[in-house]
Amino acid sequence: MPSGNEQPERPTTRNQAQARLVEQAFEQAGIAVSRHPSRGAGEPGQQALLGQAEAEEVDFLHQTGTILVRDEDVARVQGVIGTATVVDSLIVGVTVLSLEGTRFPTTIEALNEIDAQLGVGVATPNHVLSIAPAGMCPATEPEEVPGDADPDPGVCADRHEGSGVLIHVPDTGLLRGAAAAHPWLAGVEPGNKEDPFPQPPPPDPMPPYTGHGTFIAGVARCMAPAAQVVVENILSLNGAHLESEIIRGLYDALDRSPDVICLSAGTRTRYGLPPLAFEVFLRRLREHKGVVLVAAGGNDGDRGPYWPAAFPGVVSVGALSANWRSRASFSNYGGWVDVYAPGEGLVNAFASGVYECKEPPHAGERRSFHGMARWSGTSFATPLVAGLIAARMSRTGENGRQAAKALLAQARTQAIRGVGAVLLPGQDESRR
């Protein structure tokens, strides 16, 4: 029993556990990040700095002491907050400003002042996008299956599906040897020119979210066996990175002329506003005829927007439960989700080694893997849809946006009451 002066220890939630994993990786990389709790979002002083023990659920993480501003607004913003230093002209249209030396002790307080004087959304945090908090994508930690298990859903019977189509996967990279170990991954390429493969996981234990990008590539390839798939290691900080760095990677990816970009990461945002760097990037993406961005809808079990999936023009994907007839309990939902696809209990390529669970209720549990895993989340419904788009492109000659539009129209005709538009493997009308 605690004494009268002590507080009983509050249980760590899954959301908090995931946030801590990401924070630790950023700390090791020398990048300061702050928490924005779910309660009192946007209020001065409500953020919890890295290293503080907080009981609040984490709404989102952002870089401490920097903001994102449109190029045309830089002078106006500097007029409000003082001598903010230009850290980086990130891409054409977006500038990163440092708050060091200004009068604002926190990023949120600076943004509140900018909101009051210039309007909400002129400047935004430099959000952390991740495959974990907030939005928890994947929805579960990987589960053991035999090393010789078949992928589920299985490989499409027509091995020519996806021929001539390039799917780009900005994620945790491709595990060394995975393409040789699994026939359906043959020819899948790493996207990074330097250090193309992430470090192989040590046998005991492997790092968090190891194999996420490989699993995603496997799901996409099962739907489109002949598609060219490139997996980039961009979410290199325990499955996360800054919005600014991810956008830089996506700009570089456009040089490859992809047909489909499959992004299984995202974030909540301050006031639910669109993340500024993605807003500018998507305007640029429209100049690349036919390229479609498919993004995970997140796993909060919530109807609020999850970005970048919630942008108009992005194919946002929610998850169906294991029976394919209802929405998965973890999946986000709402009018901004375009389509639901199988996302619970999928089986595909993974790492080999020992994994130690980090999240309640299984924290501390050790699991042994032999190249395959069962995993759940909108993270994995997303490449299923990306693969179906690629497969349709190879059959019809449509570009990525045209194929996505046609599949979404079909998905609405087979909507499930109380769920929404649905896409399942093998149901594309163009096959008939």
Please tell me what each predicted stretch does.
Residues T140-A227, R248-R256, V260, V354-K358, ...:
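Active-site core segment of subtilase-fold serine proteases
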Residues P2-I131:
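Inhibitory N-terminal propeptides of secreted protease zymogens
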Residues G4, L235-F311, R366-P383, R417-G420:
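Substrate-binding/access-modulating region of protease and related hydrolase catalytic domains
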Residues P258-G266, P275-A277, S394-R432:
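C-terminal subdomain of the subtilisin-like protease fold in secreted/lumenal serine endopeptidases
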Residues D171, Y306-S394:
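Extracellular S/T/G-rich loop segment that most often corresponds to the catalytic His/Ser-adjacent loop
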Residues D88-S98, R103-L166, A178-A181, R367, ...:
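Protease zymogen maturation seam
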